[in-house]
């Protein structure tokens, strides 16, 4: 049986009160519509068609080649939205999954179970349902005495008895594809909203003698639709818990999983420990046996094995095996910390390579530089890389020693085994084995204290 997917993503989302198209709001680092399409892709459909509206260009840019697109000119309801997919799917044999783009919590497993149930029962239509603790706002599933689905009643159209029902429509359906598009021809907008409801297809099919069923999924939380910022936060919290639990099942320890925010695409190796109040975002990869302490923030970076990150920020950078950083240090984009290197406290590294076993202990800025191996960078060293117009590069060779308080003014080359005396301002290249001293000589003036204004305070 061929499988198809229609994703409804044309809604404006006015309740979000945002310039951003609703389905493009992110949950754990991925847009809602990406979550939906990725979950649907797991059922291996022949085609995914996304229905877009006013934000079509933005949605198409995000999904790219994951989907085909059809345009709904006016938002006239879910039935009208699905009908726009007829140009792509109308003549296909198979089963079609219909899902909204603002439900990021659905899983591939749930979609697979729905397809399986739909096929085994030989249904023309199957609605995915759930038992809601508070069903207000949801469409209710109305069944006959034998438990067969009669229809779905929307909140604004239901009578008091119907609104007592707690089994709700999740907004996900599986249809016989050809029967779906044939039934859509008979849907009208005779309802409180004046819209064409996709749910009316169920009653049309049933009245035609077709089998209409419902598969009740066990986890109601998957069905959460995001219509405002409150629901967005709720979805993020649920997704965060799901992501963290998956990492824990794979051998990662979380000291306080409720306060560790990990994006959906992050990869973490086993025996790594994540403390509370940690943020790891984007396409970050973290190896095995690492320790990430509270207050750390890692974005789009690659962390090797046995790395310790202590209350530091790492952005679009790489730390190789057996390195450490922090506390309170910052790797800005394009920093590379090679094996065994040490980045101490209050160090900023930007667009620089720190060689193997090199130590940058504290209170240092390293920008636009290449440092070799086994170098010691003293406290308070500044790599001065900017003249107000252009940025320049500094090279420091293997086994060099940079004394505390030094400033290296680029462009400059410090050779292997060179020695920079403390508090020097270096403006010229330093050759191999040489020591550079560039500071004013100390002058002691005997008995000068008594000439200072301070001495008068002693009288």
UniProtKB/Swiss-Prot annotation:
Residue numbers binding UDP-N-acetyl-alpha-D-glucosamine: 8-11, 22, 72, 77-78, 139, 154, 169, 227, 332, 350, 365, 376
Region of interest: Linker: 230-250
Binding site for acetyl-CoA: 385-386, 422, 439
Gene3D superfamilies found in the cross-reference section: Hexapeptide repeat proteins, Spore Coat Polysaccharide Biosynthesis Protein SpsA, Chain A
Entry keyword Cytoplasm: yes
Compartment(s) of residence: Cytoplasm
Catalytically driven reaction(s): alpha-D-glucosamine 1-phosphate + acetyl-CoA = N-acetyl-alpha-D-glucosamine 1-phosphate + CoA + H(+); N-acetyl-alpha-D-glucosamine 1-phosphate + UTP + H(+) = UDP-N-acetyl-alpha-D-glucosamine + diphosphate
GO cellular component, one term: membrane
Transmembrane regions: none
Co-factor binding comment: Binds 1 Mg(2+) ion per subunit.
GO BP of this protein: cell morphogenesis; cell wall organization; lipid A biosynthetic process; peptidoglycan biosynthetic process; regulation of cell shape; UDP-N-acetylglucosamine biosynthetic process
Protein family according to the UniProt entry: In the N-terminal section; belongs to the N-acetylglucosamine-1-phosphate uridyltransferase family. In the C-terminal section; belongs to the transferase hexapeptide repeat family.
Protein name per the record: Bifunctional protein GlmU
Species of origin: Lactobacillus acidophilus (strain ATCC 700396 / NCK56 / N2 / NCFM)
Gene from which this protein is expressed: glmU
């Amino acid at each position: 049986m061929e499988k198809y997917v229609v994703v409804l993503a044309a809604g404006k989302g006015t309740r979000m009160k945002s310039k951003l198209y609703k389905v493009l709001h992110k949950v754990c680092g991925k847009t809602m519509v990406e979550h939906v399409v990725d979950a649907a892709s797991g059922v291996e459909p022949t085609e995914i068609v996304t229905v877009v509206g006013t934000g079509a260009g933005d949605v198409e840019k995000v999904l790219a080649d994951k989907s085909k697109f059809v345009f709904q000119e006016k938002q006239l309801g879910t039935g009208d939205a699905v009908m726009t997919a007829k140009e792509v799917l109308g003549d296909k044999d198979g089963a079609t999954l219909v899902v909204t783009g603002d439900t990021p919590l659905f899983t591939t497993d749930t979609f697979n179970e729905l397809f399986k149930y739909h096929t085994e029962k030989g249904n023309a239509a199957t609605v995915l349902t759930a038992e809601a603790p508070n069903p207000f706002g949801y469409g209710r599933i109305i069944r006959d005495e034998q438990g067969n689905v009669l229809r779905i009643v929307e909140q604004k159209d239901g009578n008091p008895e119907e609104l007592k029902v707690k089994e709700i429509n999740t907004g996900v359906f599986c249809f016989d594809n050809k029967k779906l598009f044939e039934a859509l021809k008979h849907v009208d907008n005779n309802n409180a909203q004046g819209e064409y409801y996709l749910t009316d297809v169920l009653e049309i099919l049933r009245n035609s003698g077709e089998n209409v069923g419902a598969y009740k999924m066990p986890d109601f939380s998957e069905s959460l639709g995001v219509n405002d910022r409150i629901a967005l936060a709720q979805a993020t919290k649920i997704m965060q818990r799901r992501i963290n639990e998956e990492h824990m099942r794979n051998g990662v320890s979380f000291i306080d999983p409720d306060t560790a925010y990990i994006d959906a695409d992050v990869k973490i190796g086993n025996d790594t420990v994540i403390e509370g109040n940690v943020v790891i975002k984007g396409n970050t990869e973290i190896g095995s046996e690492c320790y990430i302490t509270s207050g750390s923030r890692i974005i789009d970076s690659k962390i090797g094995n046995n790395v310790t990150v202590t209350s530091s920020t790492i952005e679009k950078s790489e730390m190789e095996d057996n390195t450490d950083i922090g506390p309170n240090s910052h790797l800005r984009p394009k920093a590379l910390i090679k094996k065994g290197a040490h980045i101490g406290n209050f160090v900023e590294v930007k667009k620089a390579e720190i060689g193997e076993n090199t130590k940058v202990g504290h209170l240092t800025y390293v920008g636009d530089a290449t440092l070799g191996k086994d170098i010691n960078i003293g406290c308070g060293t500044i790599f001065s890389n900017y003249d107000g117009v252009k940025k320049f590069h500094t090279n420091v060779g293997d086994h060099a020693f940079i004394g505390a308080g030094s400033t290296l003014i680029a462009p400059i080359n410090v050779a292997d085994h060179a020695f920079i005396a403390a508090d020097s301002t270096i403006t010229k290249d330093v050759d191999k084995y040489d020591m550079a001293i560039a500071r004013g000589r100390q002058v002691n003036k005997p008995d000068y204290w008594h000439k200072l204004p301070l001495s008068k305070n002693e009288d």
